[in-house]
């Protein structure tokens, strides 16, 4: 993927984002992407917001963009969430069947890998875990939907995929004008809980999620009666970084929930009942 270059890994990383943002803006300006056209500034802003997963919009994603345009936004969110170099490097490696030593040096710097031999293994795991969680989230979102609020099964599927990816990448984009406060969705608490969980998994980051998955996989294999008796694996524990992150995330979430619940109980939450 990478030949000898004057750019260091940090410059290459930033440059790749500028490139995908410009490409995304160009794609969003295609006639098929919008119903009534879009200015370059609005397209550039939307593309930047999607790639940098900020969730800020200057036009309504639901009514301004066609399904094709929304797919472009979804692609930009996914690439921005994973990092364009993760995509480009891994799939180039996959199709070419190998990598140069210099490529691995660049990627190990970008991915903070301690061993060169683990660079592509790490990239593969990042993509695998990301797509797996997004797939599970999309299925759960689909099962939580009320058919009466979406016109067809294909719309339900697209809605599920879009919001699963948007949630995992912490992007904040929605195909609903008022996001999930939209009438017909604001009281769908199962949908909200699924999106919350997906937000958290995406926000924790790959190293934490990978460590948690490895830990629970090891614990499950220890008690699995169908596991091969010769099963042997390095004992997995939650490392200090994972523990600190999990405790901090849980604590802040619980404290914020309690404060928001009592402060807004008779205001924005007044239309809900109980903990809903």
Label for each model-derived stretch:
Residues 1-276:
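Membrane-proximal intracellular helices of multi-pass ion channels
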């Amino acid at each position: 993927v990478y030949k000898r270059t004057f750019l260091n890994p940090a410059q290459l990383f930033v440059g790749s984002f500028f490139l995908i943002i410009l490409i995304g803006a160009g794609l969003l300006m295609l006639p098929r992407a919008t119903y009534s056209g879009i200015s370059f500034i609005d397209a550039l802003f939307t593309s930047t917001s999607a790639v940098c997963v900020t969730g800020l919009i200057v036009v309504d994603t639901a009514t301004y963009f066609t399904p094709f345009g929304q797919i472009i936004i979804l692609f930009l969110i996914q690439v921005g969430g994973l990092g364009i170099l993760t995509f480009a490097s891994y799939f180039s490696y996959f199709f070419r069947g190998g990598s140069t030593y210099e490529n691995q040096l660049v990627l190990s710097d970008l991915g903070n890998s301690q061993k060169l031999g683990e660079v592509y293994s790490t990239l593969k795991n990042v993509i695998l875990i990301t797509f797996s969680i997004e797939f599970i989230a999309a299925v759960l979102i689909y099962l939580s939907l009320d058919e009466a609020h979406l016109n067809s099964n294909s719309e339900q599927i697209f809605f599920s995929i879009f919001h699963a990816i948007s949630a995992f990448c912490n992007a904040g984009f929605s195909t609903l004008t008022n996001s999930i406060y939209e009438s017909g969705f604001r009281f769908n608490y199962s949908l909200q809980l699924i999106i919350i969980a997906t937000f958290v998994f995406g926000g924790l980051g790959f190293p934490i999620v990978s460590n948690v998955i490895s830990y629970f996989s090891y614990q499950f294999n220890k008690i699995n009666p169908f596991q091969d008796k010769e099963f042997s694996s390095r004992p997995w524990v939650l490392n200090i970084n994972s523990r600190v992150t999990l405790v901090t995330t849980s604590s802040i979430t619980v404290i914020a929930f309690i404060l928001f619940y009592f402060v807004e109980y008779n205001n924005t939450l007044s239309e809900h009942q109980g903990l809903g």
